[in-house]
């Protein structure tokens, strides 16, 4: 197990984010999305992201576990990650996914007015800032 407190904080952020993703989608699918002012096709646009976000959540949890357990890379993993610990490589993969999804949300919310207060703009702003911030934290930590 890692004795580095920064590693544990990063791993905790990864797991909390993964749990946040799960809670978001559970709540999202329990909401009708018929509020006035939502852009045309909102539900059809958003629904497929459950798949990418689920993959992201799994990568975040696996990365966190591997980061704190200090598991040395197996020979097959060395081919993929060089000699970098696999948890760090997965952290960078998660960072790329977070960056992509955060920029996509930023562009979509800005284009469709979903940053306005009446359209849960505060929550949407928090999602984008949190997503992009964690991406930068992971990149700075593991590059």
Regions found by a protein language model. Give the residues of each.
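Core segments of transmembrane alpha-helices
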Residues: 18, 53-62, 128-132
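Membrane-water interface at the C-terminal end of transmembrane alpha helices
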Residues: 126-143
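Membrane-helix boundary connector in multi-pass membrane proteins
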Residues: 103-123, 140-143
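Aromatic-anchored segments of alpha-helical transmembrane domains
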Residues: 20-23, 96-106
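Interfacial segments of alpha-helical transmembrane regions
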Residues: 3-15, 79-94
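Juxtamembrane helix-break-helix junctions at the cytosolic face
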Residues: 60-91
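Hydrophobic transmembrane helix segments
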Residues: 16-55
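Non-cytosolic membrane-interface motifs at loop->transmembrane helix junctions
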Residues: 39-46, 89-90, 113-127
